[in-house]
């Protein structure tokens, strides 16, 4: 019997091609029946399918559907349109498809496969890919089906549009088995350094960073009829913390590039000075992504085709209601009653997810902000224009305005954390009696102690799985990205009490602000980026804790971003790569360390060993061995509580009651060490690139 896992995975292959053609590197053919044919091939599809099948080495039989699924809403999205979860109409479509596929009885994989084949042939390919990925991730019987790397199936969302004409030529001219020269993606293809924001293009346009954002929202969708798909443990708080860390990391990069911290978008009626020209084409719609000219302004949105009829006044009213909730420390429910406001509830209110306690009162400020920004060029659909990159989860982080918008969103969360209703931590919550950190350091092979080394690397990604209607065989695009030398943390601890467990929390932050002045803790606490968090045993007496940078619970392994590359021999998590689906939303390992500067950027390295009795999550059936540990701090754990009882970002998520600087904040169970991040401004070829 054909392996159903492999068959389900093949539905990701070449998403704009019909299933009557062979799929996968081995040219497998789905044996379509008349009821499963795409609409455009109902007259001659069987004959074409049979013709392709004559040369196929693998044939996949499909169970006929006596009652094919119906998609009255989702089928209204043209197959050549682009899809955005930020648009209310598209949310309705996605909800319909997810409902239908989730409701197919469990362990009826033949029925599921045929239904997915039917849906794939009738729905917009981007809509289907999103819904199909969510379904595979959330059905118990499909969790072992690998979700295809999105950059391989829809490469046009990540790479310069000029690359695809070259890619088709390469696929057409070079027979399979003949080495194919990679297509070089320029480092500066969206702007020049005349535009100061372009200094951050290496970061904003990084494939791994954009994949992170897309995958996180796949694991944490904000809408679905099945509430359990959305209502994961501490989901709203994780929405806050994941985006807060993005802003902190972005500000670190800005300071390293001699720029000020990002300015929040506070006045929603003022012009947006930042322009962005993405230089991307959609292979689905065969159109270029619309640019945004400098100094454009938000306009009231009236686009019935997208389900959008929202005014700036609506947004300002919802904003006032959110700010009132923060200032009062309470959330008002639809029946007029109130309850105390917490960070998890606020996260769901601001986004807003279906978990928002009062959507009518608090609106959907975050999501609509993306839509306002994406349609500044055509707010009323007068010109039949598509949305900009900021309205697509896979491209939104490319746009400089994403960070200005999220700086405002984060500021609202910080006001809650700084309010009188969120108590600063007491000493007893911060200390760990009997535990004293005596020294901390970072060690990088070939570098002095406490120096982290970054450099540029050129890596290849295979475009062929998304290169529809072209010959098979790998077609590589080579692009340049930031990377760093692997390093390790060395932490020496004296435990004067009994043997115990402790949570090690590791952060770094720039030592000085953009004016080269020492930080006040009220500002620096928002600049600390969490590098790792893990639980370790302490024996009585002296302990030395060593931890490899590749073990971080915030990141996914390097080769998970560049999926076709062979496993890194020094990555201790390589055996767990099959468990990528849920934990794959972590931060890319190659972007763990900020760029630094060639002269050496001064940073501070903070380590805290917190009291495990206050950190521990007691959960029935909890096992110390979890199959998927990668990025658990950013992604949580499947079907489990978030693996840390403390507030996300602890101990820097709240202002200090007494300390005015990070030096004042240090207790015996903490340590601070000056480190340097030095950029070696050269490009190294990835030794794991396929030979060409």
From Swiss-Prot:
Keyword check for Glycoprotein: yes
Description of how the protein assembles with itself and partners: Heterodimer.
GO molecular function: metal ion binding; tyrosinase activity
Coiled coil (residue ranges): none
Main location: secreted
Record's protein name: Phenoloxidase subunit 2
Role noted for this protein: Copper-containing oxidase that functions in the formation of pigments such as melanins and other polyphenolic compounds. Catalyzes the rate-limiting conversions of tyrosine to DOPA, DOPA to DOPA-quinone and possibly 5,6 dihydroxyindole to indole-5'6 quinone. Binds to the surface of hemocytes and is involved in hemocyte melanization. Binds the A.niger cell wall component alpha-1,3-glucan, a fungal pathogen-associated molecular pattern (PAMP) that activates the host immune response.
Signal peptide bounds: none
Disulfide bonds: 583-628, 585-635
Gene Ontology biological process terms in this record: melanin metabolic process
Free-text remark on how the cofactor is bound: Binds 2 copper ions per subunit.
Family: Belongs to the tyrosinase family.
GO annotations of cellular component type: extracellular region
Prosequence residues removed at maturation: 1-97
Superkingdom of this protein's organism: Eukaryota
Binding-site list for Cu cation A: 213, 217, 243
Residues carrying a glycan: 256, 295, 309, 494
EC number per UniProt: 1.14.18.1
Active site: 351 (proton acceptor)
Pfam families: Hemocyanin_C, Hemocyanin_M, Hemocyanin_N
Cofactor needs: Cu(2+)
Catalytic activity: L-tyrosine + O2 = L-dopaquinone + H2O; 2 L-dopa + O2 = 2 L-dopaquinone + 2 H2O
InterPro entries given in the database record: Di-copper_centre_dom_sf, Hemocyanin/hexamerin, Hemocyanin/hexamerin_mid_dom, Hemocyanin_C, Hemocyanin_C_sf, Hemocyanin_N, Hemocyanin_N_sf, Ig_E-set
Keyword terms of this UniProt record: Copper, Disulfide bond, Glycoprotein, Metal-binding, Monooxygenase, Oxidoreductase, Secreted
Positions bound to Cu cation B: 366, 370, 406
Cell compartment(s), UniProt: Secreted
